[in-house]
C-alpha cells in the first residue's frame, strides 16, 4: 500500500501522467457530451460502447482508403451515427426495449468490427501532435492541454456547443421538455419520440468522433477490444455529474485520471498488484455514484418509453 501512495505522489508531479489523463478524459467526454443530451431527453442509450467501436473502425477504414485523417474522422462520425440510427429507430419508433437494443448492438458491433478487421486488415497510423505556441510551454499541464493531436482539440468547442444546443435553442428546450414530462410535451405539439431519436443521433455523432480520436490519435491502429469499456464509463460520468454538462465533464476528468493512473504507475517503475490496478477504473465510477447519487435528480422520464395515449 505504501508503494501505491508513493506512486500516486510521483504521478501527480509527472507531466506524462497529465498528458495521459487529459487524453483519456477527452475520449470519455466525446461520449459523455452526446449521452448527456440523450438522457436529458429521457432516452437511455447503453450502446455508447458500440458507437465508439464503430467510430474507431470507421475512422481506421477512412484513413486506410484515403490516407487522410480528416476523412477518417468523418467516416468515424458516420459509423457512430449509423449505430445511433439503429438504436433510435428500434427503441423510439418500433418501441423495442432500450436496454435490450443497446446490449444487442454492443455485442453485434464487437463481433462485426472484429470480423471485418480480420478480413480487411486496415492500415493506419497515429496522427502527429500539434503544439499550440506558448500555451504548450506551461509547466506540467501545457503539453496535456495544448500539445495533443488535432482531434483532441475538437472537444474544446464541442462541450460549449452541446450546452448551447440544450439551453439556448428551441430544440434544446423541447429536448428538456420531453425528458421532464413527455405527456405534457406531446399535448403542446412536440413529437416526443422524434426528439429522442434526434438526441440519440447526437450520441452517435459525438461517440463516433470519440472512436475516431481513439484509433487515429491515441492508438494509431484498430483492435476489436480497443474501446475497453470506456463507453460505459462515459455513461457513468453523466450519472456521476447529476445529468449536468459541467458535472459530466468533471466526471470524465476524474475517471480519465484514474484510468491514466493505472497505466502511469508501472511506467514510473512501481510494482503494484495488477488486479488492483485493473479494478481501479471500474471502482472509481461505482464509488463516485454511490457517494453523490443522493444529491442529484435524474430527468423525470429517464428510460421511460413514450407511446401516445398511454400513461
Regions found by a protein language model. Give the residues of each.
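Extracellular/periplasmic helix-loop junction at the C-terminal end of a transmembrane helix
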Residues: 110-141, 262-270, 294-303
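Glycine-rich helix-loop "coupling/hinge" segments at transmembrane-helix boundaries
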Residues: 49-50, 161, 217-246, 251, ...
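Helix-loop-helix "hairpin" substructures at the membrane interface of multi-pass membrane proteins
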Residues: 144-222, 245-250
Amino acid at each position: 500500500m505504501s508503494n501505491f501512495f508513493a506512486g500516486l505522489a510521483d504521478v501527480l508531479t509527472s507531466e506524462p501522467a497529465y498528458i495521459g489523463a487529459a487524453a483519456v478524459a477527452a475520449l470519455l467526454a466525446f461520449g459523455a457530451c452526446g449521452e448527456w443530451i440523450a438522457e436529458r431527453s429521457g432516452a437511455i442509450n447503453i450502446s455508447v460502447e458500440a458507437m465508439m467501436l464503430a467510430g474507431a473502425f470507421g475512422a481506421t477504414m477512412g484513413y486506410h482508403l484515403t490516407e487522410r485523417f480528416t476523412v477518417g474522422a468523418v467516416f468515424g462520425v458516420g459509423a457512430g451515427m449509423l449505430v445511433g440510427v439503429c438504436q433510435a429507430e428500434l427503441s423510439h419508433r418500433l418501441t423495442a426495449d432500450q436496454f435490450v437494443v443497446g446490449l444487442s448492438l454492443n455485442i453485434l458491433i464487437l463481433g462485426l468490427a472484429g470480423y471485418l478487421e480480420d478480413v480487411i486488415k486496415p492500415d493506419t497510423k497515429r496522427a502527429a501532435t500539434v503544439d499550440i505556441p506558448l500555451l504548450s510551454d506551461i509547466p506540467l499541464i501545457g503539453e496535456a492541454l495544448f500539445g495533443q493531436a488535432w482531434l483532441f482539440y475538437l472537444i474544446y468547442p464541442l462541450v460549449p456547443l452541446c450546452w448551447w444546443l440544450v439551453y439556448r435553442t428551441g430544440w434544446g428546450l423541447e429536448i428538456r421538455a420531453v425528458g421532464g414530462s413527455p405527456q405534457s410535451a406531446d399535448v403542446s405539439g412536440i413529437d416526443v419520440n422524434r426528439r429522442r431519436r434526434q438526441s440519440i443521433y447526437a450520441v452517435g455523432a459525438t461517440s463516433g468522433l470519440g472512436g475516431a480520436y481513439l484509433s487515429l490519435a491515441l492508438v494509431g491502429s484498430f483492435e476489436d477490444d480497443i474501446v475497453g469499456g470506456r463507453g460505459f464509463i462515459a455513461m457513468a460520468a453523466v450519472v456521476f455529474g447529476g445529468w449536468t454538462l459541467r458535472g459530466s465533464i468533471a466526471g470524465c476528468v476524474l475517471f480519465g485520471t484514474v484510468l491514466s493512473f493505472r497505466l502511469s504507475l508501472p511506467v514510473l517503475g512501481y510494482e503494484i498488484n495488477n488486479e488492483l490496478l485493473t479494478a481501479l477504473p471500474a471502482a472509481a465510477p461505482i464509488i463516485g455514484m454511490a457517494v453523490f447519487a443522493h444529491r442529484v435528480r435524474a430527468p423525470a422520464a429517464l428510460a421511460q418509453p413514450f407511446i401516445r395515449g398511454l400513461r
